[in-house]
Amino acid sequence: MTSVRKRKMNRSSVRKNTRRVKDKKKNINIHSNPIIAANWDKSLTLQQNYKKLGLRAKLGTLAGGKEQDVKTLSEIKAADAASKPSLADIEQTTDPAKIPEGEARIIRDPETNEVTSVIYGTMKVGPKAETEGESSSVIKQLEEYAQKHAQVKKERKPSARENEWLEKLHEKHGDDYDKMMWDKKLNIYQQSAGDLRRRITKWKKAHNVE
């Protein structure tokens, strides 16, 4: 026999929330960088997106294994056939970037049939090459964006009161920074000798003092 509380729950129109979290995958919205936002695939996880873009989600060493890219043999063969150029294209080109890596084009003299030059291919083929090309283009865009939006570091300018203090220290002790450091009347904040040296050097440069 069910309890009174259970009977009330069964009669209630409000159903029990059996699934509090609809999707455990966090819906990530990229707002900080427009290039990453434009190339972000919401169907992939954070790790997969970063790998696709040629970035790393974590700078430290990986604690576990890597996710394997599982494909059928027919898919691999179809991708290789689509990415690999035809023999006729290789015979007509002299650009190493258009010849697959591991192959070469031999150019012979039409009269003597002697080998005049050998062009070794540098083009990477296969699905890995496509992802590498895509990620490298994104990285190039990110580098250009970072260079364009980089903030110029502003040099700190000492105040009039600080200039007056440095002038008093220099007049009293010259370039003896150890004495400046132990001067309890002027060096009330106990600045180190190295810090005083840097401040005095900048002060000298700003006021043309030798």
UniProtKB/Swiss-Prot annotation:
Any GO BP annotation: ribosomal large subunit biogenesis
Location in the cell: Nucleus, Nucleolus
Gene Ontology cellular component annotations, sorted alphabetically: nucleolus; preribosome, large subunit precursor
InterPro entries listed in its UniProt record: Ribosome_biogenesis_Nop16
Keywords (A to Z) from UniProt: Nucleus, Ribonucleoprotein, Ribosome biogenesis, rRNA processing
Subunit field text: Component of the pre-66S ribosomal particle.
Name of the protein: Nucleolar protein 16
